[in-house]
């Protein structure tokens, strides 16, 4: 199993500086990770640094809350793609979802996907804030949205992905939508387990430690 090819090497801290992005990129090149995942203001910078690499750039939008108006999400996605991102990780509108306004949530996702062309969209449903029935419903919405991935977590709630999250999500989406497990992965054994349960991508800021088979004490 080529673990590196499952990993989105992630740096989403608001205080991240150019030297931190440089370090992220150097690590991604060294381990040949599938992608880096960064905030949208760094996409153009990272694209220049990765111009001779096949490592993908994933940009988060309206992160970490997902509570902005749809037009703002659409505009940020368009700009991130124009700057060099080929993948977008968006947060669904959790408040609207909790209100039962599923049509709004669906249209919010569809509107972003509509301006992305063939680029990949991952939808973060923030499983830590949902019960089992809500996880199922959120996955069903993502299924109908045209997005390529459903993703567990932002890393900013009280926990990241759990094995039970992935089991519920996989049972709901089958092979129709891919799954990204993010946060909460503390060792290589846990990483492998998430993949075995059905995750096609892993989001973590501790990618290097995981590749070196170290135990993660803190971090996303």
Curated annotation (Swiss-Prot):
Organism of provenance: Mycoplasmopsis pulmonis (strain UAB CTIP)
Described purpose of this protein according to its UniProt entry: Catalyzes a reversible aldol reaction between acetaldehyde and D-glyceraldehyde 3-phosphate to generate 2-deoxy-D-ribose 5-phosphate.
Domain of life: Bacteria
Pathway assigned to this chain's UniProt record: Carbohydrate degradation; 2-deoxy-D-ribose 1-phosphate degradation; D-glyceraldehyde 3-phosphate and acetaldehyde from 2-deoxy-alpha-D-ribose 1-phosphate: step 2/2
Any one GO MF annotation of this record: deoxyribose-phosphate aldolase activity
Family, per entry: Belongs to the DeoC/FbaB aldolase family. DeoC type 1 subfamily.
Gene: deoC
Disulfides per UniProt: none
Example GO biological process: deoxyribonucleotide catabolic process
Gene3D superfamilies reported in the protein's UniProt record: Aldolase class I (3.20.20.70)
Catalysed reaction, written as an equation: 2-deoxy-D-ribose 5-phosphate = D-glyceraldehyde 3-phosphate + acetaldehyde
Name of protein: Deoxyribose-phosphate aldolase
Keywords: Cytoplasm, Lyase, Schiff base
One Pfam family cited in the UniProt record for this chain: DeoC
UniProt enzyme class: lyase
């Amino acid at each position: 199993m080529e673990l590196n090819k499952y990993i989105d090497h992630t740096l989403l801290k608001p205080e991240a500086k150019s030297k931190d992005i440089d370090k992220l990129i150097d690590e991604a090149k060294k381990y040949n990770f599938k992608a880096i995942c960064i905030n949208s203001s760094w996409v153009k910078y990272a694209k220049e640094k990765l111009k001779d690499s096949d490592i993908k750039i994933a940009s988060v939008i309206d992160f970490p809350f997902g509570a902005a108006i749809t037009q703002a999400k659409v505009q940020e996605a368009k700009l991130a793609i124009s700057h060099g991102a080929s993948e977008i990780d968006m947060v669904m509108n959790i408040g609207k979802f909790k209100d039962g306004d599923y049509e709004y949530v669906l249209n919010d996702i569809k509107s972003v996907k509509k301006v992305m062309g063939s680029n990949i969209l991952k939808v973060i449903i923030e499983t830590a804030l949902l019960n089992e029935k809500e996880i199922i419903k959120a996955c069903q919405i993502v299924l109908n949205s045209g997005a390529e991935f459903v993703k567990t977590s932002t890393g900013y709630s009280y926990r990241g992905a759990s094995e039970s999250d992935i089991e519920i999500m996989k049972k709901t989406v089958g092979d129709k939508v891919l799954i990204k497990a993010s946060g909460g992965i503390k060792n290589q054994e846990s990483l492998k387990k998430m993949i075995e349960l059905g995750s096609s991508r892993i989001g973590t800021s501790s990618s290097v430690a995981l590749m070196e088979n170290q135990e993660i004490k803190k971090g996303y």
